[in-house]
Each structure stands twice: as C-alpha cells, then as structure tokens.
C-alpha cells in the first residue's frame, strides 16, 4: 500500500478543523440576582465557604450560601451599581485585615481602612478575620487583674486578664460609659485596647473618640467602626476584625482588652443577612447558628501560656504570657435578660455586670446590681488589698437591699437592723462614681477601708462624696509613699493596715469635708 503525502496532510488539516476545545470556567460566574446587599451567582463551581469573590469596580463579596446550582454572597459595602449579568471571579482568599502597632490611635472601618483622615496605616501584616481560638492546652488560668477604675466593679465583680465579662442592661444606662472608662484606665498599664462600635450613630462614635483623645487613651486604642448606615455584612464582621487586631498583641506576649459595643446589633445584622439568604428562621427569627456566631468570637478571648507565645513568635518572645480580655455589651429590652441573645451570651461569658434602670434613675452611677452581677473567674485575679478589704462590701449591700424592702412595712426596727440599714446606705453612697474619673488601686483601697472600718458612721449621708474626695486628697498629699506602695504592689499586711488606720484617724480629727 502506497501512502500519499497529500492525502495525509489533507486528513490532518480536516481533523484539526473539526477539533473543538471545550473549556469550562470554574472560577468565573455571573450575577443572576441582586437585592438588599445579597447577590446570587451562577457558574462558580470551585468557590469555598467564606471565600472572597471579586466584583466589578474592585469590590468584594463573601460567599455564605453554597447551593446546588448557585452561590449566595453578601456584598462588602455599596451594591447599587451591581447588575444582573455582571461577571465575578473567585479569589482563593478569605477576608483579612491589617494588624500591628501602626493601628493604635487610629479609627478604621471593618476592613481596616483608615477613616480618620490621618493618612495611610503602617501595618505589620494581615490576619484573617476568622481565627480558631486557642486550644485547652495552650491556655493559662486567669490570675492577673484588669482594673476598670470603678470601685463597684473592682471590689465586687473583679475582671481578670483573659476573661470574658458581659456588660448587660437597657439602653441609655451607662454600659458604654463603663467600658470607655475601663479603656481610659488602661492608658498607663500597658494593656492595648480595641473598641468595636457596631450599628451606632456616627455622632456617638465621634464623641467616644473625642473623649478617649481628651483623656490620653486614644494613643493606646484601636477604634473599629461599622455605623448603623453601613451594610449589614460590615456590621456582622466588625467584631471579628477587631478581635484579629487584638489577637496580634496577645500572640506576642502582651495584654489587650477589647470592647464589643454591642453584640445585640451584630446579631440583628446577622439575622438580616440570614433571612435575605433564605436560611430557615428560629426563635425570634434568628438563624439556628446565632449561638455559634457569638461563641466562636468570644472563645478567642483568652490568656495563652508562654509556650504558645514562644511558638507563635518563633522563639523571639520567651517566658511571657499573652491575654485578650473581652467586654461584650448586650442591650436588653425592659430588663429582660431571658431573651434569646442575652441568655446565649450570658452562657458563653465568664460573668456579667448587670446595670439596672431603677438604680440608674435613683441616682446610683454606675447602676450595678450586685445581686445578679457575678464574675466567675475574676476572684483569682483580684488585687490582694482590694480582695482583703472588699469582702464585706457585697454582703453589706445584699443585706441592705433585703432589709430596705422589709423596713418599708415594719414600723419599729431594732438597733442592729437600723445599724445595718445605715451602713448599707453609706456603702451604696460610697459606690457612686463620676464618669471619666477612674480610680487607682490605692484610692479604691482607702475608700473601701473607710467603709469597712466604720469611719463613715459619723459622716452625714449627703456628705459622703465630699468626705471621700477630701480623704483621697489628704492621703495622696500626706501619705504619698503609702499610696505609691499600694499602687505598685497591691499588697495588704499589718503595716499597711496600721498606716491606713493612722492616716484616717488623723484625717477624721481635722473634720475638713
């Protein structure tokens, strides 16, 4: 058989012409629906849960629903210019935010972009917003205090480094004020702070930033903002972004404090997203995983051991533990702590500070209810002198409230009951404290010492505030060395007790209040 070269070349040409290249774009899709910040995409075969999707105009969305023939994604920011038919691409990345010391003193949005007009941020790298919390073996028990500067909190509901302490109460009752004062009190302690504002008015946040700056605490603080006017996706992700920024310090053997203000609004934003994605609603129309929404966030607040820090820093930092302390805020409706989100967060956290409307309206600020407020782990971290002196404060207030209710119906009271009532009234008055005036350990110790040792008995009820102010001024000027020792060591012994007693005896003799 003779082969004809012409025939062979014609046959090859024919085969080449008939050959069809069938390619399938697995990482590019088309928007088929846009509504309320949610887009539905067809054609993204290789997308992963939580992956960032690139949209036209250098914007991004996050894939949350992976269905058989479409993907539900939530847009990070404005979505008005998106239209059906727009092409989108997968990125192979999850959402990351800038972290580092360059963020301290700055106001940023959920994505870590500066919104304070102070120019670009010099960050130390990027960190994913969703991080797995440290494991059991990597953690260390809480045994170092975080001083809030509030007598009522530091004496009765102490907070430790690495703890999660919920601040809960109705609106306009002083929840944010308590958290902001706790941040202000850290300006000289070395604890780095993160304040996350979720779903608040821009004017309110501007006021908070101004107050932090006035009191010299902004240089030590990162403010993460997702205002009420921003997309629900940004409000939902803001706490996770702030947490990653706080974890940067924890993982390098430092201490940090994060305030989530507030997680009720984050839960509402997540409910909005879930309902728009057509996920089945549960109790109060929240999705089934709203508990996990908060638990995976709050579990990241922890105290990690020196081995974890050494491993993370590749041996650069040795022998130092790190901590991230969380103060989540929850807003209740008419004091109802049995609602869905409040009960969830109460069960996740290591205690709660309950602020009560009736106490607030009666003039008690901070309006802490010591009866149902608790710190489950903070007792081990409490400063020695405060722990020793404040043992009777909580019981005195509890007995006072009980007797005060009873005494309304009883006409004649015995001397012991009357003495308990009078002591309780004075302790309640002593627990009052002005906003933006956090107290040092020594100042708190002197105030509590005066109550515990009976120095308030001879003071008129309406003069207790003046008595305390004059006493602290006297002690800081006449017994400066003692106050310095208490602040530096936090110890309490017979010598310190003797000096405190001598100082108070001398002050009471002066009658200068």
Curated annotation (Swiss-Prot):
It is a peripheral membrane protein. It is an enzyme of class 7 (translocase). It catalyses: ATP + H2O + 4 H(+)(in) = ADP + phosphate + 5 H(+)(out). Coiled coil: none annotated. It is found in: Cell inner membrane. One of its GO terms (cellular component) is plasma membrane. ATP binds at residues 169-176. Keywords: ATP synthesis, ATP-binding, Cell inner membrane, Cell membrane, CF(1), Hydrogen ion transport, Ion transport, Membrane, Nucleotide-binding, Translocase, Transport. The record marks 373 as: Required for activity. InterPro entries: ATP_synth_asu-like_sf, ATP_synth_asu_C, ATP_synth_asu_C_sf, ATP_synth_F1_a_nt-bd_dom, ATP_synth_F1_asu, ATPase_a/bsu_AS, ATPase_F1/V1/A1_a/bsu_N, ATPase_F1/V1/A1_a/bsu_N_sf. Its EC number is 7.1.2.2. GO terms for molecular function: ADP binding; ATP binding; proton-transporting ATP synthase activity, rotational mechanism. PROSITE patterns: ATPASE_ALPHA_BETA (PS00152). F-type ATPases have 2 components, CF(1) - the catalytic core - and CF(0) - the membrane proton channel. CF(1) has five subunits: alpha(3), beta(3), gamma(1), delta(1), epsilon(1). CF(0) has three main subunits: a(1), b(2) and c(9-12). The alpha and beta chains form an alternating ring which encloses part of the gamma chain. CF(1) is attached to CF(0) by a central stalk formed by the gamma and epsilon chains, while a peripheral stalk is formed by the delta and b chains. HAMAP family: ATP_synth_alpha_bact. Produces ATP from ADP in the presence of a proton gradient across the membrane. The alpha chain is a regulatory subunit. Belongs to the ATPase alpha/beta chains family. This is ATP synthase subunit alpha. It comes from Shewanella woodyi (strain ATCC 51908 / MS32). The gene is atpA.
